Amino acid sequence: MITVVKRNGRIEPLDITKIQKYTKDATDNLEGVSQSELEVDARLQFRDKITTEEIQQTLIKTAVDKIDIDTPNWSFVASRLFLYDLYHKVSGFTGYRHLKEYFENAEEKGRILKGFKEKFDLEFLNSQIKPERDFQFNYLGIKTLYDRYLLKDANNNPIELPQHMFMSIAMFLAQNEQEPNKIALEFYEVLSKFEAMCATPTLANARTTKHQLSSCYIGSTPDNIEGIFDSYKEMALLSKYGGGIGWDFSLVRSIGSYIDGHKNASAGTIPFLKIANDVAIAVDQLGTRKGAIAVYLEIWHIDVMEFIDLRKNSGDERRRAHDLFPALWVCDLFLKRVLEDAMWTLFDPYECKDLTELYGQDFEKRYLEYEKDPKIIKEYINAKDLWKKILMNYFEAGLPFLAFKDNANRCNPNAHAGIIRSSNLCTEIFQNTAPNHYYMQIEYTDGTIEFFEEKELVTTDSNITKCANKLTSTDILKGKPIYIATKVAKDGQTAVCNLASINLSKINTEEDIKRVVPIMVRLLDNVIDLNFYPNRKVKATNLQNRAIGLGVMGEAQMLAEHQIAWGSKEHLEKIDALMEQISYHAIDTSANLAKEKGVYKDFENSEWSKGIFPIDKANNEALKLTEKGLFNHACDWQGLREKVKANGMRNGYLMAIAPTSSISILVGTTQTIEPIYKKKWFEENLSGLIPVVVPNLNVETWNFYTSAYDIDAKDLIKAAAVRQKWIDQGQSLNVFLRIENASGKTLHDIYTLAWKLGLKSTYYLRSESPSIDEKSVLDRSVECFNCQ
């Protein structure tokens, strides 16, 4: 006889009827699974004095091991079994306690922020919770939710169930609304039905005492020691609270540059990048993983060759930074020179820093002037040779990322208020940034203070004229001896990404888009006001432009379920129509919110204020990819232009397509805008390898689920170009290539096509060998946790 050790330590005979109740519920109404098969295979592993916990884990593992291409529903069996166990751990029974009890318990344990639940009718909201929606999770989805998002106590025991999580997030984000119960319910409905999902930081931290809700930050380093080290401090603080970072180093003077009038005194950007690398390692993200920092450099910078080699395993280790993610800020002129097989001139930004402030024709004019200037430092390289080096590194290591400076800035709705200097870690965010500005603070012996620009000429009482940054305590100005001269900073701009994604596998009709997009735009706008900001500059920037990034996920599932082949004419037309609707309703909602809550501060003189939308600045070649003409749009764009001019816009930036790997796993759909990896693969988890089958795989969808490696990479680029027409920011776009199909010409054609079609960036180049192990494990180690 087999005996069982209960949770309370009591030993009693195994009661198979109790197990049968759970196995029956776990297999009910699921095709291709068998209650008896589950019980028989699990019982083979039972032993005397087995614990109830071990029985539960054995049942779950038995179901997980049965997940396969022809039996994908075992994933839902495993999920249900996991949920039954979770209910008992959290509630003490198979079900949900009252919402009020959940809040009181979580507050008592210090895991939920006190003070916002009082703004709501807890009886009403408790009555709206739908526990049955838990059964939407497949096994990997519920495991991901448990491991990354559900709240736990100090001993790592779960204290939260999925629907309570969704409701408390909804409440937190609706707390300042005029009708908080109504808006919270709208947020809950969309999130809990998996129609859309917030990015990882919002899901994990909304409702908690550490409500850092933003995914990524983008900043810029000035060319002085004070500014460089202030940047490290800022990166450290941002990383501490779990933010992914994109940082522009293009202003930092190159190797061989001048320092204090001495030529060849500068060691260039690389030593400073090594320190940034150490910041990423030292300031791990809440103790869970090392920081993630992408560093950007303009392609005309003299240090570009070393920058490309930043992560190489060979060479001088003092010039390597293996934990950074290098990205190149590529201008049109460089790629024109590549196509012309012409020479490319590299400059020192110390002598031509205005190039970082210019793009398009203004940049080209100034660049040509610098080329003709005999007085400044220059280096020359054949543009095609530099391009080959970039592409070779891209193929070998997937890096450096490529981002196209002119494409990004041409379509910047806030070009009147600054310039886009780089993207973020995942290359989908494009917003204005600016480095700190430094000036001289002169403190006199009488305690008074005066300020000067660094290079401002000042005449001392000794009749000596010098730059303000050369003043010392030996100088006297207007009869007042100087006590000390110090450099102080005026904050620049560090951009913020607040992200969420529409699930196209569920939301793909005009009616549903019209219903869901306004809810998610409002939710993201509320994130801005309720966010915890690591420093003042970040908050000021976010409140200045009120940037959000609404994206999409589940495109491959949506196409398969509509029996549309990837890269086909129908594919391009379908996503064109969907993205138009999403863009239209996102802009419309922001205009409505502007009337309700006020416009963003930089609205005046923006492209929005002139009625100029992303589609109005779309790339001409991209427009030719679908047959929709200029006057053949489904939406009333002219009416919306007039509305925006009258109302204003609540948000300076609206749309961006992020990677979504975690949240797409959570809701059981395909990742972001990408084709599938394989029909079946394995995800690595704390529990081991978990088999995963693409969603809703059946005879109707089988032929329409095509591996990314079996799709022409140019079709990925063309699909991205169609989406980009409607997006004011960018897309996190991976390119997939089989090794046997790779060549210099292939890579050249792919990435020049991306540039020509108006894309703003590409993310990783993922290559795969022709022989793939049957137990293919998807490598997510290189992915940004925060944009997921």
Curated annotation (Swiss-Prot):
Q: Which residues form the ATP-cone domain?
A: 2-92
What positions are marked as the site Important for electron transfer? Answer: 763-764
Annotated dTTP binding sites: 223-225, 253
User: What regulates the activity here?
Assistant: Under complex allosteric control mediated by deoxynucleoside triphosphates and ATP binding to separate specificity and activation sites on the alpha subunit. The type of nucleotide bound at the specificity site determines substrate preference. It seems probable that ATP makes the enzyme reduce CDP and UDP, dGTP favors ADP reduction and dTTP favors GDP reduction. Stimulated by ATP and inhibited by dATP binding to the activity site.
Does this entry carry the keyword Acyltransferase? no
The intrachain disulfides are 216-497
> Keywords on this record?
Allosteric enzyme, ATP-binding, Deoxyribonucleotide synthesis, Disulfide bond, Nucleotide-binding, Oxidoreductase
Q: Where does GDP bind?
A: 200, 424, 428, 661-663
The molecular function GO annotations come to: ATP binding; ribonucleoside-diphosphate reductase activity, thioredoxin disulfide as acceptor
Q: Which GO terms describe its cellular component?
A: ribonucleoside-diphosphate reductase complex
- Cited CDD domains: RNR_I
Where on the tree of life does the source sit, at the highest rank? Bacteria
Q: Which reaction does it catalyse?
A: a 2'-deoxyribonucleoside 5'-diphosphate + [thioredoxin]-disulfide + H2O = a ribonucleoside 5'-diphosphate + [thioredoxin]-dithiol
Q: Which residues carry the site feature described as Important for hydrogen atom transfer?
A: 216, 497
Signal sequence range = none
Name the enzyme group at the top EC level.
oxidoreductase
Query: Its biological function?
Result: Provides the precursors necessary for DNA synthesis. Catalyzes the biosynthesis of deoxyribonucleotides from the corresponding ribonucleotides.
Per the record, the similarity remark reads: Belongs to the ribonucleoside diphosphate reductase large chain family.
Subunit structure and binding partners = Tetramer of two alpha and two beta subunits.
Protein name, as recorded? Ribonucleoside-diphosphate reductase subunit alpha
Organism equals Helicobacter pylori (strain ATCC 700392 / 26695)
Q: According to the entry, what is the taxonomic lineage of the organism?
A: Bacteria, Pseudomonadati, Campylobacterota, Epsilonproteobacteria, Campylobacterales
